[in-house]
Amino acid sequence: MAEAKGTASIQFFRGVDEPVVPDIRLTRSRDGRTGQATFVFEQPQALAPETFGNIGGMWMVDEEGEMVTREVNGKFVNGIPSALEATYTWKTEEDFERFMRFAQRYADSNGLGYSQNQKSDQTDAATEEQA
């Protein structure tokens, strides 16, 4: 569980926080009800040679409890594990809101910020200006 109020962590082994902070990308359906968060961990501690055990999922733990995804894949370079990619899928607006509360706590716990990709909006605006 999370150690203190307001903290959040990610675990590949229950009770063991992963110290490597992932790159996280969100996608949502046009109606906003469903979507995915893709986490990419480069050189995570969970893949270190001294780590024993099978990775059975990724747990996102905070003061509200935990969310879990079993969709975790390893990336290998020349036969050596180099990254983990996990995908968390939500199917309701409530699930998305819960995920975003976790994401905010995780960002706060790790000194991270949030940025939104505006590329599609900028592309549309540029196209309209050229017309």
Curated annotation (Swiss-Prot):
Listed Pfam families: Psb28 (PF03912)
Q: Which region ranges are annotated with the description Disordered?
A: 110-131
Membrane topology recorded in Swiss-Prot or TrEMBL: Peripheral membrane protein
GO process annotations (BP): photosynthesis
Q: List the GO cellular component terms.
A: photosystem II oxygen evolving complex; plasma membrane-derived thylakoid membrane
Primary site of residence: membrane
**UniProt feature, compositional bias: Polar residues:** 112-125
Compartments where located:
Cellular thylakoid membrane
Against InterPro entries, the record matches this protein to: Psb28_c1_sf (IPR038676), PSII_Psb28_class-1 (IPR005610)
- The keyword Membrane belongs to this UniProt entry's keyword annotation: yes
Keyword vocabulary terms for this entry: Membrane, Photosynthesis, Photosystem II, Thylakoid
State the oligomer form and interacting partners.
Answer: Part of the photosystem II complex.
Provide the family line: Belongs to the Psb28 family.
The record's NCBIfam families line, in alphabetical order, gives: PS_II_psb28 (TIGR03047)
Q: What is this protein called?
A: Photosystem II reaction center Psb28 protein
Origin species, per record, is Synechococcus sp. (strain CC9902)
Q: What's the encoding gene here? A: psb28
